[in-house]
Amino acid sequence: VKCMEITENAQTFSFEGFRLEAFKVNHNVLCYGYSMVIDRAGRFDKDRALEQEIPMKFWSRLQKGETLEENGRVFTPDMVLGTERKGLKVTYSTDTRPTESIRQNAQGADLLILEGMYGEPDKLVKAREHKHMTMYEAAKIAKEVGAPKLWLTHYSPSMTRPEEFMDDVRKIFPAAYAAKDGWTMELNFDEGK
């Protein structure tokens, strides 16, 4: 296990195949939200490869992002790849009031996971005092950023049936769900983009 300390208001950590973007949120103690991002290279352009007389034996490796050399000639991925395509992104944030940092980092997310500490409208004052978000505030953020789907989580222990509030929450954002432990979702690349 390698620990990495977040030392800025926003910080990006790159790993093999994805990156983690941490961003500061607004809670009573230091707290961060996160976006997990898988970037996606552009499509392989066979015509460009042939035009530039790039040996076929290198095509696959160039598609994977390698830079290669043969007989003093350097071959780079940008020689054969088109414009970067839309990847995948999941943004997650709890223990916070609504913030601009959430809105900025949730742009383009395929799945937005936010706290819905309170479902009762009369708990807004309590949410503000304790630096949490209501389900309705989370739904408003999802609507503002154009998220395709919102999972609410991090409920108050006093809220035993969060799904009871979903009809009202969906009036703000129709694709909102009261998430449960163990939920999974398969995200796929959009082949049209």
Describe these PLM feature segments.
Residues T7-L152, R161-D167, F189-K193:
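Metal-dependent phosphodiesterase/nuclease catalytic metal-binding core
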Residues V1-T7, E21-F23, Y177-A179:
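General small-molecule cofactor/ligand-binding pocket signal
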Residues T160-W183:
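Short acidic, glycine/proline-enriched helix-loop-strand junctions
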Residues V1-K2, F15-E16, G87-L88, I172-A175:
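A short helix-to-beta-strand connector/capping loop
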Residues M117, Y155, D181:
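Short, ordered loop/turn segments at secondary-structure junctions
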